[in-house]
């Protein structure tokens, strides 16, 4: 979590948009359920949205367009879910996608390795051509 926290804090300091999809074990998560309150979403920054592609059924795309955002940074768990789902969804909608591999996790190392390979090389060209794999300490705002 230190890598995600560092990237989160840098985004906040730069005035970048931060958006959360909260699910939780029961599908009814709220900002009070965030494991580390240092990551607590502010009003208007979150939705309760399940599924791997966080664009579906959410206000994410409207918020990105409203701010003229062209590049998204995807963090979270599970890498093979949100990383591939939202990362691919972003690329297919024309966004450049930054994948800091040290800010996504999965249930095991195989799922993490598969997701990284899929997003960087193994997925469809429309996705892989829009993805940059990196580490969180290389992301600048």
Residues of each region from the PLM?
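Short catalytic helix/loop segments, enriched in acidic residues and glycine
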Residues: 1-5
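Von Willebrand factor
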Residues: 8-26
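Active-site-adjacent betaalpha module
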Residues: 13, 26-141
